[in-house]
Amino acid sequence: MRSASILSAALAAFAPLASAADAVSGAAEGFAKGVTGGGSATPVYPSTTAELASYLKDSSARVIVLTKTFDFTGTEGTTTETGCAPYGTAAACQVAINKDNWCTNYQPNAPKVSVSYDKAPFNPLIVGSNKSLIGQGSKGVIKGKGLRITNSAKNVIIQNIHITNLNPKYVWGGDAISLDGTDLVWFDHVKTSLIGRQHIVLGNGASNRVTISNNEIDGSTSWSATCDNHHYWGVYLTGSNDMVTFSKNYIHHTSGRSPKIAGNSLVHISGNYFYANSGHAMEADAGAKVVLEGNVFQNVVAAMQSGLAGKVFSSPDANTNAQCSSYLGHTCQLNAYGSSGSLSGSDTSILSSFSGKNVAATVTANDAKNVPNTAGFGKI
């Protein structure tokens, strides 16, 4: 009995100690207001990649705390095959994996190239309902795999982690965070970097109520579809019935899809800092209803791609912005531009779509100027 007690004490000495930092910080604003994730479940501390995958996928309510880097690189082997180079063969250009015969069907005239890629990002970590995934301090890193929330999973919080290194050289190399068929999802203070395909993707099924806040979408890369060290595949919001709050995020060194919105998506974009975009930031295509307010566009060639069919209210002037108060609960705030193109769109007909819904509090462009200092991993 005494030896068993000694063993138990020894094991306890090496177990991670729970702290106040091992709980969700703050609460979601906007459409995902009320999300609780794993709630008051006792925190668990995965020590292996297999244990992390198991905790995320199971049916229990969980608070999962990451205390180190979980590196999936090479865990499922690599593949060498023929891909294509639709954007050119220069060293700074992304080349493409022939995923689902994409090269064959859509880029038949592109030069054929050999591609060697890691297989792990093609099998993302599946996240079940009632989960909080939290990074401890600046330690919670997932390398070589993204997260996928799908199959009616709901009530999920992802906070203070860094997802990185998903075959960044290759189009179709992997998505960092993907949602399809969900409800009540909040990801906050997450950094994504060196991603092959989308940093964030919602669709094609309904993602319903989602809040994306205080994240850093880092598009800096050595390989891009625009061959200029700016990642093109940023944020893709095209779910069939989505309400998305996109607030206080830092999106930088991208060249497109920052974000792209279509499907059937009601989106509130407020208080974000868009920086160093070599192409265009927002795309609003058919099915998009978008309000943009209190954002900063700094060194963005085009704040918005023109000629698309989405409905946009860009908070164009103080008088028009006052109409927001009846529907969003506050007067919409002007956006700010520095060495950038400007937004267009003053479709007030979409404002009523926000009436009676959980809308995030107003943020001014002056507030948004500090977002690069507060958004992302390790900044809670």
Curated annotation (Swiss-Prot):
- Enumerate the UniProt keywords alphabetically: Glycoprotein, Lyase, Secreted, Signal
UniProt family annotation: Belongs to the polysaccharide lyase 1 family.
Recorded catalytic activity of this chain's protein:
Eliminative cleavage of (1->4)-alpha-D-galacturonan methyl ester to give oligosaccharides with 4-deoxy-6-O-methyl-alpha-D-galact-4-enuronosyl groups at their non-reducing ends
- A single GO cellular-component term on record: extracellular region
EC number, as in UniProt: 4.2.2.10
The main place the protein resides is secreted
Which range is the signal sequence, renumbered to this chain? 1-20
Protein name stated in the entry: Pectin lyase
Gene3D superfamilies attached to this UniProt entry: Single-stranded right-handed beta-helix, Pectin lyase-like (2.160.20.10)
**Glycosylation site list:** N130
Top-rank taxon of the source lineage equals Eukaryota
Give compartment(s).
Secreted
**Source organism per UniProt:** Colletotrichum gloeosporioides (Anthracnose fungus)
InterPro entries given in the database record: Pec_lyase, Pectin_lyas_fold, Pectin_lyase_fold/virulence, PEL
Q: What class of enzyme is it?
A: lyase
**Pfam families for the chain:** Pectate_lyase_4
Q: What's an example of a GO molecular-function annotation for this chain?
A: pectin lyase activity
Using the record for this protein, list the coiled-coil segments as residue ranges, or answer none: none
List, alphabetically, the SMART domains matched: Amb_all
